[in-house]
Swiss-Prot record:
Belongs to the ribonuclease N1/T1 family. Disulfide bonds join 5-103, 23-84. It comes from the Eukaryota. The active site is at residues 39, 58, 92. InterPro entries: N1-like (IPR000026), Ribonuclease/ribotoxin (IPR016191), Ribonuclease_N1/T1 (IPR051386). GO terms for molecular function: lyase activity; ribonuclease T1 activity; RNA binding; RNA endonuclease activity. It catalyses: [RNA] containing guanosine + H2O = an [RNA fragment]-3'-guanosine-3'-phosphate + a 5'-hydroxy-ribonucleotide-3'-[RNA fragment]. It comes from Trichoderma harzianum. Keywords: Disulfide bond, Endonuclease, Hydrolase, Lyase, Nuclease. Its EC number is 4.6.1.24. This is Guanyl-specific ribonuclease Th1. The lineage of its organism: Eukaryota, Fungi, Dikarya, Ascomycota, Pezizomycotina. Pfam families: Ribonuclease.
Length: 106
């Protein structure tokens, strides 16, 4: 999966790295650094996420290309389900308030 969030393009390897990190934290029942990520994503926006079922978890995907380890999460998130399948990539960029919109290509 590749994605474009606002003006930021994420390669398939970047999406994979973020989703793999999220999966490892979910399976371990832990979070990145002192953060709350990954955490349950309630999907108030009603995204369809490739027909996958909840629970969904959101985890930051960083424009720097590094894997999130704590600190500022930025605007973009990879979403996985409980089986660690990539559900989609979403962003606060272009959304109102604390809501999300889908990134292009997802």
């Amino acid at each position: 999966d590749t994605a474009t969030c606002g003006k930021v393009f994420y390669s398939a390897s970047a999406v994979s790295a973020a989703s793999n990190a999220a999966c490892n934290y979910v399976r371990a029942g832990s979070t990145a650094g002192g953060s709350t990520y990954p955490h349950v994503y309630n999907n108030y926006e009603g995204f369809r996420f490739k027909g996958l079922s909840k629970p969904f978890y959101e985890f930051p995907i960083l424009s720097s290309g590094k894997t999130y380890t704590g600190g500022s999460p930025g605007a973009d998130r990879v979403v996985i389900n409980g089986q660690c399948s990539i559900a989609g990539i979403i962003t606060h960029t272009g959304a109102s308030g604390n809501a999300f919109v889908a990134c292009g290509g997802t």
